[in-house]
Amino acid sequence: MQKEKKSIISSLLLITATAIWGFAFVAQSEAMKHIEPFTMNGLRSLLAAIFLIPVVMVSDTLKGKKITLFGTNEPERRKDLLLGGLLCGIFVTVASSIQQIGIQYTTVGKAGFLTTAYIVFVPVISLILGKKINRNGWVAVVVALVGMFLLCVQTFGSFSVNKGDVLMIISSLFFAIHILVIDKFVSHTDPIRMSCIQFFICAIVCLVCAFIFEQPNLSSIFDAWFAIFFAGVLSAGVGYTLQIVAQKNIPAHITPIIMSLESVFSLIAGVIVLNEKMSWQERIGCILIFIAIIVAQTDFKELKAKFNKTNADNKTAVLKADESNEKTEE
């Protein structure tokens, strides 16, 4: 019962993260009108890392722990924390950077759909690594993919593959590896500290790349300050940290299915903020993604067992009542 409760809470945390990411998409789109990709990623990651430092301190205080750099005296846990944070930082940097480059050569709809290829990559890589995926998981993957296709690809006849599409798929592969790295380390490390390290790594790499490949200037940065703040504190600092915390109690193959809600929330954000209209195709896509999440999270064998037990108990109660009535009549 306690395990189910933790799983439900973690799912709600991950859904909250996807809602933040979906609404942050509008802010990020606005920021790209003023600053370039590496500058945007670097600044928002730096802001996220700084934001998480007091969060770590408050978390330790609430737990009654002494505030230290690593949060543990165990050398093995320190090593895992640093390695997990380093790997997460590298993979999220590579994934988001390739995505920003790839989106210049493809449509937004196709980019959104191809990015969600991590829905397939995560269970396939898990299978290669020897982890079993139940039937529900595979059914949910297929349903979610169909939903994402309807949501993101508006013109069926024009679906062709170009350089941008290939880059988006490669980006999705690195997002999948990022999810699996979190799954590997999160059970025995502090998730908030790991997220903080992740963003310091991402900030350093992206800002170095920004000064090499781009021409960042203060005027443009000030023009995009609200979008950077929103993306840094909420999308990165809160959203990605909620993802890491949630993955403690959610199987790796279910995580990307829930994360696919990001596209649903970005669509809702477009309707609310930009007054965009939602087509019947997009509505069906949203419904299919919700169905996929329910299928992935539901243990149908357990439900069937409970249903059979309830029926058996009801039949037993009826038989006992009949026997009691017969004795009364005698």
Feature locations, PLM:
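Helix-helix packing/entry segments at the starts of transmembrane helices
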Residues: 41-43, 111-117, 182-203, 236-272
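Hydrophobic alpha-helical transmembrane segments of multi-pass integral membrane proteins
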Residues: 8-13, 39-58, 83, 137-143, ...
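Hydrophobic/aromatic residues within transmembrane alpha-helices
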Residues: 31, 40, 44, 102, ...
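Hydrophobic transmembrane alpha-helices of multi-pass small-molecule transport proteins
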Residues: 52, 133-153, 172, 206, ...
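Specific transmembrane alpha-helical segments of multi-pass solute transporters/efflux pumps
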Residues: 24-25, 56-115, 150, 232-250
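Glycine-/small-residue-enriched transmembrane alpha-helix faces in small-molecule transporters
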Residues: 1-43, 89-90, 94, 98, ...
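C-terminal-most transmembrane helix of multi-pass membrane proteins
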Residues: 3, 7, 45-46, 53, ...
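Hydrophobic/small/kink-forming positions within alpha-helical transmembrane segments
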Residues: 19-22, 26, 53, 89, ...
